[in-house]
């Protein structure tokens, strides 16, 4: 039997007390109940949208490592994908590239062919610079390299138990899509 923990919306850089409380209690609970897992999946929004400063706090790195330790795994069994809050949506050229690609279905992207122009992928990729720095504090260089090719925004990691397809759902997300 495979056991995993799925976490999302950690929202570091946010001072909401309920968010902080839930985050703080999870590792304690896992240790107290001696819950062991084979894998952890972290599906984005590690930080709050367009955090200021636009960085990932060291606390978020330590937290994910602590969760791995609490359930008895190493970080190679932690799988992370960026959420819409984990990218810098204000990077120069990013919004313009997304508009060219697909904004309100007036862009050039056709799902039948699945092609996005290299210049546009590079512009979008710049919004993930801090996310990749964050990952480099958790993963080996080999693992970080999988996140480091703007022309291959999606990738697969094979494990002994299954394959994990990492889908970059932030490719076409703009700051104007943020819920109020």
Model-derived regions: residue spans:
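N-terminal active-site segment of His-dependent metallophosphoesterases
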Residues: 1-59, 63-78, 88-89
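Extended active-site neighborhood of metal-dependent phosphoesterases/phosphodiesterases
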Residues: 61-179
């Amino acid at each position: 039997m495979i056991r995993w923990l799925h976490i999302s919306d950690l929202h570091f850089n946010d001072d909401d007390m309920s968010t902080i409380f839930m985050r703080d209690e999870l590792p304690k609970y896992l240790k107290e109940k001696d819950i062991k897992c084979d894998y952890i999946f972290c599906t984005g929004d590690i930080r709050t949208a367009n955090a200021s400063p636009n960085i990932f706090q060291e606390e978020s790195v330590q937290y994910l490592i602590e969760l791995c330790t609490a359930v008895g795994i190493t970080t190679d069994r932690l799988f992370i994908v960026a959420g819409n809050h984990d990218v810098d949506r204000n990077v120069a050229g990013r919004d313009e590239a997304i508009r060219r690609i697909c904004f309100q279905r007036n862009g050039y992207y056709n799902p039948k062919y699945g092609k996005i122009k290299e210049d546009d992928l590079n512009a979008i990729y710049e919004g993930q610079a801090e996310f990749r720095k964050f990952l480099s504090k958790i993963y080996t260089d080999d693992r970080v390299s999988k996140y480091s090719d703007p022309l291959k925004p999606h990738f697969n990691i094979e494990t002994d138990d299954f394959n994990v397809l990492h889908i970059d759902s932030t490719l076409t997300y703009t700051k104007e899509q943020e819920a109020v």
